[in-house]
Amino acid sequence: MALQDGTLGEPVSIDRLSDLMLRLQGKGAHNINLVTPTPHRDAVLAALKQAKKDGLSIPILYNTGSYESVETIRSYEGLIDLYLPDLKYRDDRLAKRFSKAEGYFSVAIDAISEMIRQVGFMQLDESGLAVRGVRIRHLVLPGCVFDTRAILDAVAERFGTDCPLSLMSQYTPIPECKDPALSRRLTQREYDSAVEYCLSLGFTDVFTQGLDSVGTSYTPPFHDRIDL
């Protein structure tokens, strides 16, 4: 499956995708990570069902920006063990400006609600590996701590403060981004303010990051090829 611009990746059949999942399991993978699989939903569903029939038993992780319909998420029920949804924006003006995502928040919060209905909050095994459930991720953006606070308020109201969170600080400006608001990194003061507000609300399970997480090392090496 190629990336959106069509310059990377390769087409694979349903049988091949199913086989790749089984090969990853055979090589010791902890889970199968489906990153934004929505454009290929029908093929992914078919491949998952085939792989599970043929012995796939490691957790299946669904990694998403959450701009998805409840119907789409519901179609994966019983197949997905772990959901890692982003909750990017509370203010729809930011969603439209930065991501061209009209009505982002209402769509995303309903999709996440369906994920939680299916698998609950994230659970870890005895070795500390996630095996089931949901952890909501939020990337704190420069100049947008006010929106982070609104996101945290909304999560606390909708899901309670036991909802697992990941507050990320890794925003990295790239030359292709022309919006001046996103031309700089997050400051320590901004991130600390976001974390302090999160804790003041009483959230009990929060992953945080140091600002040393900023940089291109967090950008996946899309050009690397792994032979399976």
Write out the residue ranges for each language-model feature:
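Conserved Radical SAM active-site core
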Residues: M1-L82, D91-R93
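Conserved radical SAM core fold
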Residues: L3-Q4, R41, S66-S69, L87-F105, ...
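Alpha-helix N-cap and loop-to-helix initiation/capping positions
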Residues: V12, P39, S99-V107, G143, ...
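A cross-family glycoside hydrolase active-site/sugar-binding cleft signature
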Residues: N33-P37, L61-G65, D86, R135-L139, ...
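Anionic-ligand binding region
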Residues: K96-S127
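Auxiliary Fe-S-binding modules of radical SAM enzymes
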Residues: I116, G120-L228
